[in-house]
Every structure is written in structure tokens, then in C-alpha cells.
Amino acid sequence: MKFCSLFHVLSFCCTLAYAVPKSQFLQLHSLSNAIPVEWKWYGSVDEDSGYVYLTSKDSNEARSGSLWSTSVLRQVGWQLSTSFVAHVSENENTFFAIWYTSAVGSEGPVFGASDKWDGLLISQEIDQTGKIFVRGYLNDKSFELAQFTDPDLPPFAKCTIESSPEALNNIILKYGDQSGLELFVNDKPCFQVKDVILPQGYYFGVSSQSTSAKDLVALSNLNILPPDTSNNENLNPTSNTKQSVGDNTSPQTVIDTEGLNAIKADLAKLFNLVESQRQKMDSLHFALTNALERLNDISSTSQFPSERFNALEKLLHDSLSAQSSTADGTSKHLAEFEKEIKKAMGNAYSPYNLTNFMVFLLLGAIVSYGIMLVRRDRRRHKYL
């Protein structure tokens, strides 16, 4: 009799062990660069064939289930990546939520979380056609979400994503102190809000709630990654690997754009200097022409002493000498710069050969014009 009782007790314990998952703590990350996170489940959660069902497949009543991280995240920025399949078979929609809150949620009326939560909620409602209605909420324990939505708490962002029934949907949620909050659904941008500020040291959670025994949400992965993971395709381990285009082509030529931009900047400065000298020379030419005409008129009448003429001639001579010196310096600068351009052209890459050739032609024109100004200055100086 005692042996039979002991046998029944052992059989009952084995049945319980088989009916529930082996462990209440899961490691769901599947990417090599993911931050290791341990998840604890609440409510009706099942494991089967590589999926984690947030609502039990065997329950015949409305149910909710959730997974919450067992430790907080200390990083300023982060990315959450997950993939899920929603089975919606009746009139009522199925709900799936992503959380970032100050406290771990427990079983409750809001997608499997308690009311008056503090933090971020990304709500996803899936209908029979597979269409996903996404809404983002922020709460500071002020609002009670006794149902799926609260009219007093409008979403700060929302979008609608077209999908198909029982399709594998990929979710990527990014947060950074500079970029704000971004959400991608099936590689499509849902929203980006830059003025959302989330504190450090909060818990992550995912949850689901359904009103039908035939509706459920199954997760295939759940990864928390550093904020510097930039390639969206690498965040999704279930996406197909795309063959890169041009694998057999030769590597592209690296172009020294900084050096070319520096040359263009120097050329622009030099052109402005030559243009300024040209304007000064034109003004000086006009003034000297009038001065020489006036000097000839005065010398013909001999109304002033000769020292006045000598002083005026010295003034004109000094002015022309100064302009000639400036023109000589400009010409020398142009000649040196021409050598640098030729040297740079010898080291330039093929995509910029045409640009360098045009720069060389423009430089030649500037040099020629500068030499002409110098010669004209010297002719005027010789005339005086």
C-alpha cells in the first residue's frame, strides 16, 4: 500500500515536471555581439520547437504572459531586436508589447503587466489580416491602463505596418541620447522621436495578452545589443543572407579628397588676391593717368616751383614701386603654387584627372594675367 502511494506521488511529480518548462529562466539571445541577458517568465509561457510562447497553447481561456530581464541595463544607449509570429484566428486581435520600465512587471491587465508602470511601452496590435498597429506610450506612474489603451494617455508616436497572417515579424527598437528613440518593423521605419529621454538602470520586458485560446504570440529570439550596431540586417538573425554585389570586382580606388579640397581652397584664395590686385592696378592706372595729364599741364605753365614737381614725381614713383613689389610677390606666389599643383597632379588619382587639368588651365590663365600686370607696372614705372 505504501509502495503504491509512493508510486503515485512519483508519477504525479513526473507529470508536473513534464507539463511545465524545465527552467523559469531563459537565455534567448542568438547574436554574437548581444549583451547576455537572463529572462524570467510570468504567467502562461511555454517553450516548444525553438519558440517561446508568451501565452500557453494548452489553456482554453483568456491569458497573458511576459518575460522580464532579471537585471537592469546600465548602458546609456541600446538596441532591442526580436522576431515573433502572431496567430490570430478569431475576431479579437492579439496584443504584443515591448517594455522598458523602472520595475519588473507582474501579471496584470495591461498586456501582462501591472498598472501605473514607469517607463516606456511599445504596443503592437495584430489583426486577422496580419496588419500591425504600433503605438508608443510613456508613463510616470500617473496613468492606470486598466485596458489595452487609456484615452487619457495618448501615444507619443504610432504607425501601421502591412504584414500577412502568421508571418515572422522582425522588430528593432533603438535608443540613444543623441538620436532619440527609433523603431523599425520588418525593416521599415515606423517612427523616430528625438525628444524622448529614457533613464539608465531600467528593466526590459516583452508580454502578450489574448482573449481566445487559439490566439498566441511566439518569439524566436530576443537580443539586447550595444547602440553602435548600425546594420539592421545584422540585428535580425532570421533574415536571409543577401549575396553582396560585385564580390569579384577589384577594390575601388581611394581618393584623397581632403588634399584636393585643400588645393581648391588655396586656389580660390589666390584668385581673390589676384582679383584684388587687378582692381587696385586699374584704380592706380586711372589715378596716374589723371595725375600725369595734370602734371603736364602744370609743367607747361611753370606756375609752381620745381621742388613741388620733384615731390609729386617722387610720390608717384613710390606708389608705382609699391604696386610693382606687390605684383612681383603675387607672380612669385603663383609660380610656386603652379609647381605644387603640378606635383599634386602627378600623385592624383584617375577620377580627378579632368578636374586637375581644369585647375591647371585656370592657374595658367591666372599666372599669365599676373605677369601681364607686372610688366605693365614696370612699363609705367619706366615711363615716369
From Swiss-Prot:
Residues 375-384 are cytoplasmic. Residues 20-224 form the L-type lectin-like domain. It is found in: Membrane; Endoplasmic reticulum; Golgi apparatus. Residues 1-19 form the signal peptide. Pfam families: Lectin_leg-like (PF03388). CDD domains: lectin_leg-like. Residues 227-251 are annotated as: Disordered. Residues 20-353 are extracellular. Keywords: Endoplasmic reticulum, Golgi apparatus, Membrane, Signal, Transmembrane, Transmembrane helix. GO terms for biological process: endoplasmic reticulum to Golgi vesicle-mediated transport; intracellular protein transport. It is a single-pass type I membrane protein. PROSITE patterns: L_LECTIN_LIKE. One of its GO terms (cellular component) is COPII-coated ER to Golgi transport vesicle. The chain crosses the membrane at residues 354-374. GO terms for molecular function: D-mannose binding. InterPro entries: ConA-like_dom_sf, Intracellular_Lectin-GPT, Lectin_leg. This is L-type lectin-like domain-containing protein C4F6.05c.
